[in-house]
Amino acid sequence: MRSLIVLFGLKFKRAALAEVSSELRRIIMALGYVAPVPHAHLPFVRHPESDYVLEEEWLFEGITETYIPLLRVLEGLKRDGIDFKMTMSMTPPLVSMLRDPLLQERYDQHLAKLEELVDKELKHNEHYGHIRYLAQHYVSEFQQIRETWERCDRDLVGAFKQFLDSNNLEIITCCATHGYLPLMKMYPQAVWAQIQVACEHYEQNFGRPPKGIWLPECAYYEGLERMLADAGLRYFLMDGHGVLYARPRPRFGTYAPIFTETGVAAFGRDHESSQQVWSSEVGYPGDPLYREFYKDLGWEAEYDYIKPYIIPNGQRKNTGIKYHKITGSGGGLSDKELYDPYWAREKAAEHAGNFVYNRERQIEHLAETIQPPPIVVSPYDAELFGHWWYEGPWFIDYVFRKSWHDQKTYEMTHLVDYLRKHPTQKVCKPSQSSWGYKGFHEYWLNEANAWIYPHLHKATERMMELGTREPADDLEWKALNQAARELLLAQSSDWAFIMCTGTMVPYAVRRTRSHLMRFNQLYEDIKQDKIDSGWLEKVENIDNIFPNINYRVYRPL
């Protein structure tokens, strides 16, 4: 009888030892872990009352430039036998919009216009060799987008869920409408509603409770972990200084999670790996060979030619068709040279190799002093990959492929898998923090947006009052639930953020005011027992997020 070798409790025939999978060898030899975490989020923008609203195109651009390209990357990895592991957050507003039939239909029409435009560009530039080459590139790209969109039957959430079911993708949640929790902490019921509604929404869409949560803007305040524990969540993500300034100071910095006193773990962002990808100045996205974001056909083409593809009122807008590269830091947009996707893809592969090399050296250095094995957590906005950084999906693809084939120093992992493998960590109290400007709350509370908070606080107090009511009939039940929706939508951190950045400010102001006005109207109607059923039905149709919400989530804790 052939001799046997026993390895981790598994028996292998000696003759078959050479057939031990590359993944098992990787696990045996890995010194540490790397965990990229893209955060997929957009504010809830849906306007059935209008035929066209520019801000709905935030979603359409995200689908075309980020979500479908990322999905295609995952499909390619799986098809090629790469057993990838990645954690990704998908926020309730984004999931709701991706599954909304109206927005799906409008995206289909949006994609059809893009397909029409690039076909037109192909003919228009038949005598301009390189421009025609780029037009053909976009024709092929949109054909792939269309093929994926139709193959998924328009259900991108379901397509990503397949990778959740296969244990390749760990999808985590975020708060209900991306509300900025530290500025709600004086109203625990409001914080609880943001968390609990999100967890219920996740379970309705993914068929299981979430294990982790991306705190909106990675913003944490002391004691928040108690509500996370009550919601059944096992971990959350923070910016690095939230872990580094914890008490007592964690011995391993951000390279191991810390446990809060409730048992909920906190993972801190690694500065080095984040900077290499985030920064347009010292990071990869600013390379001269990459596509220039700010030079778009919508602004460059002759007006009469491009008019059918811009805003119906005649204003120009970005189309997503861009023919130029970053080129260099010295000149203006008029000095940009023509883009070449072939060389840009080559550069993305080179940068992916550099990223993998740096993570190897980082893990090797950390493993000399850290036990258990270190983990490098790299959170990013998902929309960076594809929308802002056109070559980002190529970069992610190459990082996973090179990590699988070209190194054995680290293992790509889910965050929850790391906790399973290494369940003993230091207990600390995390520090108040965010990943915003200067690391705290300044971007969401300043002279540009401070005016919204007295109104939000008053509405919160009123909603807590409504939370104790028992509805007299079905109409009041609907009104109470709609009031909860309006408050949640008004609390979105995106509106305060946009007001601070100075872009699309009128829309952010209008959205904040409209949700507060609808909430206050509902409050008065409920209190006076004068609910307008026709108006309520109209509002329910416009702001239809969280169809299964229960207003009682605002009752005293």
Each model region followed by its residue ranges:
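Short, Lys/Arg-enriched N-terminal segments with co-localized hydrophobic residues
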Residues: 19-28
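Active-site and substrate-binding clefts of carbohydrate-active enzymes
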Residues: 30-83, 90-133, 140-143, 247-557
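Acidic (Asp/Glu)-rich catalytic clusters
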Residues: 75-81, 155-172, 367-368
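Short, solvent-exposed turn/loop segments enriched in Gly/Ser/Thr/Pro and often Arg
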Residues: 89-94, 175-177, 212-221, 241, ...
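CE4/NodB-like, metal-dependent polysaccharide N-deacetylase domain
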Residues: 190-215, 358-379
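Hydrophobic, small-residue-rich alpha-helical packing segments that form membrane-like cores
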Residues: 226-228
